[in-house]
Structures are given as structure tokens and as C-alpha cells.
Amino acid sequence: MELQDLIIDDAVSIEQNTQENTITIKAGDSSKRLSDLIKDFPENCYINKQITGCGGTTLVLRNDVDYVVLVPYVNLLKSKVADNDHLDHINIIKRGGEWTDNDAEISEQLADRSKPRKIICTFDSLPALMKIKGFVPGEFKLLVDEAHTLVNLGSFKAPKCEFILHNYNKFASYVFLTATPTKREYFPDLIGHLPLCTIEWDNVRAVKFNLQRLDKGVSINNALFNLCLSFLLGREEGNAHIFYNSVKEITQVMEWLSKIVGTDGKDRKSVV
């Protein structure tokens, strides 16, 4: 489908710059869902949708195109199934998580062409899906959701991520979708040539991230403690939202803070 044929809302525009290898979708109001703006994503590109909750996977799961939607986690698979399994106008096919021993069922569903076929599959389950009788990749468009995880998970799920990267071009067309894209220079080599498609929204507030480099010998816990303390004591304005992927280390920092600030937020002793 030509780029301009994808547009539903007349306020939307799509521009392609072949020299820079980019596509720009000017989507307008960020409160609108993508399914109200475009019919489908452009083919064969890496898409930065920039915001979450705009209905990227909903768009492809509810349109009239046969799709395989790859998700990195079982919980995401369950969520997509729960949101769409009740719809009568599409045929939802599941592979991964609790839906692993269902080759015969999938083969039967694949044979039903009366409505669009939508396969939701985990990264881990793609190799098994490719072997199922009746599954022909060339009959489907592929969406790799949370595409940045191909880099993030690559260190400990390398075979699964590599399988996707070596097989995505067996599909009729493909889209790599994320709201938090990997920097272009760090793209895996096998998708580094793809056009970068950016969805621009009119009324999105820019979020500023302040990078803090740690001096040699300074632990993450010490740095985090000092950062939290600065906010709690009013030295830094605003709110701090922190993600730290360790319950043990979070507990230690909280214990340190409680000795100085207290669990009620009041200073227990002065800090120099």
C-alpha cells in the first residue's frame, strides 16, 4: 500500500525522505488512537511511535491485514489476547506461554480465511510457529513489538533474538515498533538499513532526562541515596521517579534514608 493510502484522518500527513532514509508521520493530537488516523503502518521500517498508549498493536490486531505480532514477554501476550480475543471480526491465534501445545489448533485456525488472521506470539515461540503445518510467513505482515528489546534482551536471549533478525524478511513485509528506540548507531546490523519512521504528535510535553555520571569508586547505591536525599530535603525541586531493578538494593537505600529522614518524611538529624 502506498504511504498516502494509509491515511484515514485528513489532518494526518506522511512524508518520506529517501536521502535520509526516513519516514515521518505527522499524527496531530496525541489523544487520538492510531487506528483513527491510519489504516496500517508503513511496510519494512523501524517505527518510533514516541508515546505509549496510542494503540500501536491495537491498530494491527484490528485492521484487515493478516499479521504476526511478536511480543517479548508472556504477560504482554496475555494482555493482547485479553484485549482482543472477544472480537468477532478477527481470528486471534495464540502461541507462547500457556498456549504452547496447540499446533493442531493453530493449523486449523490458519486454514480459516473468512476473516483476518492475527497471530500473537512470544519471541521465544517464533521458531516453533515457523514449523507449524499450514503456516506460511509470506502470507503475513510481521510486527515486532517493543523492538528495542532485541538489543536489551540480546545478552541473555541471544539465540531467540538472532532468530527474529535472521527470519523477519521471510514475511510479506515487516515493522519493528517501539516508543523507546535504540540509537540508530546501535541498531543490530541486520536491520540497520531499514528506514526510520517517526510518528510526531502535536501536544506532547517533552521530558528532560538529566544524566549523572558516577566517579570511579562511587557505588550506585551511594549515588542513588544522595539523589533521593536531595529531593527529600528540598535541595532539588520536583519529583524523582526512579526505576532500580533490585529489591535488595532498593531496601538498603530506603533503610539509609529512613535513618536520616524517617518514614514520615521529617528530618531526624541535620545533614551537612
Please annotate each region the language model reported.
Residues 42-61:
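Walker A/P-loop
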Residues 9-42:
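Pre-Walker A adenine-sensing motif
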